[in-house]
Amino acid sequence: MWGFPEKGVLGLRTAGEMGFQGAEISLGSFEEHYPMSDENVQREYREISRECGITLTALSVEHLNQYGLSHPMNSRRGKIALEGSRIGLETAARMDIPVVQLPSFNSGAIRTEEDFENTCEKIALLCEEAEQYGIIVASENTLSVEDTLRMFGKIGCKNFRLMFDSQNYFLDHGADTAQVLRELYPYVEQIHLKDGYNGQISSALLGRGETHFLQTARVIRETACARWLLLENYYDRPPLNQLCADPLELVRTDMKTIKTVFEMQ
C-alpha cells in the first residue's frame, strides 16, 4: 500500500471499494518504532480488511532498505535488521498475514559475497523462527538467477520463497525480466507489478515503460506462478502523480491493464 494515493486504513477501505482483493502492508520504520507492531493499529487494520473483503497478503519489513540484512550480525545495522524482522514475524502472526517480505535494496543491497553470506545467515534464522507461526519468509532482491538458486540452496528452508518484481531486475542491471521469471518461477510466492523508463523506478503505467512488462506478464500467465499480483507503481509521487489530477485514476488505468492482460472478469 506504500504507493497507493491514500494511506493507512483509509487507503485500505478505498482499495476495497475499487475492487482490490488483497493488499500488502508495511511494518513501518525503526525510527517510528514499527507502527504496525502496535496492537491497536493491528486491530484497526484487521477490522477494516474484514469489512472491505481485502486479504492482507504480506507484511513488508521496509526498514531493511536502511538497516539491511547484508550488514554483519554484530553491527548496529545488522542487529536492527534482525530485531525488526523478528518484530515483523510476530506482527504478521498476530494479524494472520501469511508472508513476511524482506527487501534487499539500498543499504541492504547484496553487492558482495560478504553481503550474500550475511543476508543468508539472517534469513535462515528468520525462516526457522517463522516455522512456529506457519509464515513464509520471502526475499525481494535483484540477484542473478545463479545467485538466487545458490541462496535457496544455502538457506535450505521450505518456508523460504521469492517476492518477484516486474521492474527491479531490469532497473538494477538491465536483465530480461521475463527470462529471469521463466527460470525462477517455481520459487515465486507473490509478484510486485510496476513499470518505468529512463532508468527511473515506477515512472510509467503498466505496459508503457521500457521494462517489457507485457512479456513478463505473458510468463506469469503461462506459469501461474504467483498466489498474488500486487500493484506497486508509486501513484502517490512524481512522476506518476503529475500525469493526472486524481491519482486514483492512474490506479484504475493499471487495474484495467491487468484485467485485460490476465483476462480477468
Describe each model-derived feature in a short phrase.
Residues G3, L27-S29, E62-N65, S104-G108, ...:
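Active-site-proximal loop/turn and secondary-structure-junction residues that shape catalytic pockets
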Residues P5-G19, T148-F160, F164, F170-Q265:
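Histidine-acidic metal/acid-base catalytic patches
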